[in-house]
């Protein structure tokens, strides 16, 4: 049972997933820092409000408060993360397309050898 577990863990997909989760966790911290320390102050500068985007809110009554700043912060984090993932996927797809094109290109030597084979077969028949 232990050897089966080891085989399962050492499979490429599981290792790739583990690396992705670890890098994703680290990347989340970077995106949050970018949003909180760079983007939020810029937005705050233009809105003239609180120094933290998280604290933006709309108070309707004492009991009813809409904390739209926290939502905006999460939307910004999502958009940054989604954009970076998009760029990463686009980059990987470009690499895969380039590799496929290289595989598809026929070797000129093989074409010449095929022509020679065809000529030899034609001579045998004649």
Curated annotation (Swiss-Prot):
<dbReference type="InterPro" id="IPR019823">
    <property type="entry name" value="Mechanosensitive_channel_CS"/>
</dbReference>
<dbReference type="Pfam" id="PF01741">
    <property type="entry name" value="MscL"/>
</dbReference>
<keyword id="KW-0813">Transport</keyword>
<dbReference type="InterPro" id="IPR001185">
    <property type="entry name" value="MS_channel"/>
</dbReference>
<keyword id="KW-0406">Ion transport</keyword>
<keyword id="KW-1003">Cell membrane</keyword>
<protein>
    <recommendedName>
        <fullName>Large-conductance mechanosensitive channel</fullName>
    </recommendedName>
</protein>
<dbReference type="GO" id="GO:0005886">
    <property type="term" value="C:plasma membrane"/>
</dbReference>
<feature type="transmembrane region" description="Helical">
    <location>
        <begin position="14"/>
        <end position="34"/>
    </location>
</feature>
<keyword id="KW-0812">Transmembrane</keyword>
<keyword id="KW-1133">Transmembrane helix</keyword>
<comment type="similarity">
    <text>Belongs to the MscL family.</text>
</comment>
<dbReference type="GO" id="GO:0008381">
    <property type="term" value="F:mechanosensitive monoatomic ion channel activity"/>
</dbReference>
<feature type="transmembrane region" description="Helical">
    <location>
        <begin position="69"/>
        <end position="89"/>
    </location>
</feature>
<comment type="function">
    <text>Channel that opens in response to stretch forces in the membrane lipid bilayer. May participate in the regulation of osmotic pressure changes within the cell.</text>
</comment>
<dbReference type="InterPro" id="IPR036019">
    <property type="entry name" value="MscL_channel"/>
</dbReference>
<keyword id="KW-0472">Membrane</keyword>
<keyword id="KW-0407">Ion channel</keyword>
<dbReference type="InterPro" id="IPR037673">
    <property type="entry name" value="MSC/AndL"/>
</dbReference>
<comment type="subunit">
    <text>Homopentamer.</text>
</comment>
